[in-house]
Every structure is written in C-alpha cells, then in structure tokens.
Amino acid sequence: MKSICVFAGSAKGVRESYSKSAKNLGFEIAKREFSMVYGGGSKGLMGIVADAALEGGATVTGVITERLHDVEVGHNNLTSLEIVPSMHDRKARMAELSDAIISLPGGVGTWEEFFEALAWNQLGIYSKPIILFDVDGYYSKLFEFTQFSVEEGFLPESTLAVSYTHLRAHETLRYLVC
C-alpha cells in the first residue's frame, strides 16, 4: 500500500467531528508514510485532509477539472496539482494513482465518486479496497439502503464485501495494511 485516494466534501458539514476526523485521517496517512491523492480543492473536508497530510510530511497530489479549479479554488500548496478536462478524467486519474479509496463525509460529488468506484469494482474495472469513513454515523442510512437493495434483489451480496466502514482514522488505515 503506497497511495490513498480520499473522496471528501468541499464543505465542512455542521459537526466539528467531520473536520476533526478529516484532519486525523490526513495525519495518519502521513504518519504511515502513504501518499495521498484527492480532488485538489482547498475548501471543506478536502482542504482539511490535504493540509493535515502535507503538515505531516506526506506527498499530496490533487486532481481537479479546470472548471472546478476556478469554483473550488484549487489548493496551491500541494506537492502536485493535475488539471484534467472532465469529471470522468478526474475520477479515472485518482483511481489510477491510488492503491485504495477512503470516502469521508460529503455531498453529491463525494457520493458520486464513491458509487462510481463501487460500480467499477462490481464490473471488474477497479479491484482495490474502497472504504467509507463513517464519522458519527454519517453513512449509516446508506448502509441500511445498501442492505435493502440486496434484500430486494438489485444489488449482489458481494457488493457489501467490497466497501468497509471504520469509525476512526487509525482503524481505517490499519485495515489497509493488514
């Protein structure tokens, strides 16, 4: 395991625990000498996790579209920032550069990144670990819905084995190195 892709919101959310967990995850990535790949923004949980990883000494690569670079204010202090033409190119590049994906809380963009990675896994395109970092139960309703989808016959049981959930940064990363 060398490089972790982090999906995260461009907002901080209302709970302080979201920011604290993003910061802890960034520090843990650096502490374990992983590099980090993420969406390249400087705001919200994205910016917090990147800043913490950088502060801890990690190499951090941002991948952002030209349009989002202007909207989200691309992070200017990264080890490297790649600007790509489309959202699809952004997700494909982040997946290509990483050995695992961790999804922090976020909105529609974060969900879409997570679900596309999950779909790629189901189709055999992406075979690396995909982890939901379930801060304060943020993803608990999603887990319930996923189980319901399995019960209703729309999702194979094997999909549940692909994504794991952890409640603390050190547990999340310990899982990846075991």
State where each predicted segment sits.
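Active-site/ligand-binding-proximal alpha/beta "capping" segment
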Residues: K91-L123
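Hydrophobic alpha-helical segments, chiefly the membrane-spanning helices
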Residues: V177-C178
